[in-house]
Amino acid sequence: MTKSEQLFERAVKHLPGGVNSPVRAFLSVGGSPRFIESADGAYIYDVDGNKYIDYINSWGPMILGHNHEVIRTAVIEAAQKGLSYGAATEAEVEMAELLCEIVPCFEMVRMVNSGTEAVMSAIRAARGYTKRNKIIKFEGCYHGHSDGLLVKAGSGVMVAGIPDSMGVPSNCVKDTLQAKYNNLDSVIELFKQNKDEIAAIIVEPVAANMGVVLPEEGFLEGLRELCTKHGALLIFDEVITGFRLSLSGAQGYYNIIPDLATFGKIIGGGMPVGCYGGRREIMEMVAPVGPVYQAGTLSGNPVAMAAGMAQLKYLKEHPEVYTKINELGEYFRNKVNELFDKYNIKYQVSGVGSLACIFFADSRVTDYETAKLADTKEFARYFRFMLEHGIYIAPAQFEAMFFSNAHTYQDIEDTLLVIEQYLKIQ
């Protein structure tokens, strides 16, 4: 029995499923999860001494690679002053100024501790501002685990084989309306059926929790126009795309400005953090200046702020990072497609910039229904093969691969070699 297996055996006795987040349990791919001991650059190391090229990157935030010196130094310096004060700090002011400078839709911002918290709070602010209750979300888009949004969600909910979650009362989701991603007609119909009742549309501008499904031409523009026409707010969930597609996120990349946006993961440089923000008149609805209550004891934690600022400042000062990681992503996707052609395989590779996903599906994936056609059993076999050969990808068909500044073309070539070995035995 490996040390990882021993740890998992201990973990299941005291942690539900042996993990603190369901997808880590490897239920959809089989086998025991690897317990990670350390990480550096593009690589992670498990407790049994195995080295992997890492394409999870802590689910996105390690855009510079693991254990980056600039971030590590900032964390150490901040921690030496104190871990948490429960009071206002200069660091959170500087972070807010930096975010409002970089993010196109931000005039004001509120720090929180996770992406889920950011989304919950943004929706509450939207409802308070518009004095409406109904929200439109898209099938297959994942916005965290808050009650009102666990309806046909993506991410781990899709691979768990459950459409929603027990413990969520029907009243919690009665104001959550479902539209089809990349289908403006479904959105138009909801506005017709719920005239003057819709507070906001929330969307992953790139549906990265559904397998990196890209917006069709005109889709995001159409959402912007519909929200403006009907007096609803447009919320971009940029927990995955933020500061990854570009320094200004998906809203900068696609030049579509939402009214509110949510971020997580990456703005903490690897520390637990999130934020939501947008137009001043909306954000001034938030307490203590407005009637929309939202609070957090550890929000704006000084160590997290230091880590986040270090990463964002580095990205701002080094635009070549985006050139490199986007080229790596494009190179990988092109080479995988060449392998599919070589072996006459009809699988799909999707992605944009430094995001990628290999779909074990015969036809192009554009929405929730086509994503569900993917062969998850085939993905499980592929995942185990990759893991056994030193490539660490997300243990779920519908998650993204993340390329970092620490990855090299040699890492990509080594990964492509393993993929080709897998295709040869099919």
Curated annotation (Swiss-Prot):
N6-(pyridoxal phosphate)lysine PTM positions: K265
Chief location of this protein within or outside the cell: cytoplasm
Cross-referenced CDD domains: OAT_like (cd00610)
Enzyme Commission (EC) number: 5.4.3.8
Co-factor(s): pyridoxal 5'-phosphate
Keywords from the named record: Cytoplasm, Isomerase, Porphyrin biosynthesis, Pyridoxal phosphate
Pfam families according to UniProt: Aminotran_3
TM annotation in the entry: none
GO CC annotation terms, alphabetical: cytoplasm
Pathway assigned to this chain's UniProt record: Porphyrin-containing compound metabolism; protoporphyrin-IX biosynthesis; 5-aminolevulinate from L-glutamyl-tRNA(Glu): step 2/2
Subcellular compartments: Cytoplasm
InterPro entries: 4pyrrol_synth_GluAld_NH2Trfase, Aminotrans_3, Aminotrans_3_PPA_site, PyrdxlP-dep_Trfase, PyrdxlP-dep_Trfase_major, PyrdxlP-dep_Trfase_small
Class of this enzyme: isomerase
Biological process terms in GO annotation: protoporphyrinogen IX biosynthetic process
Molecular function terms from GO: glutamate-1-semialdehyde 2,1-aminomutase activity; pyridoxal phosphate binding; transaminase activity
Catalytic activity: (S)-4-amino-5-oxopentanoate = 5-aminolevulinate
Family note: Belongs to the class-III pyridoxal-phosphate-dependent aminotransferase family. HemL subfamily.
Subunit comment: Homodimer.
Protein's UniProt name: Glutamate-1-semialdehyde 2,1-aminomutase 2
Organism from which the protein derives: Lachnoclostridium phytofermentans (strain ATCC 700394 / DSM 18823 / ISDg) (Clostridium phytofermentans)
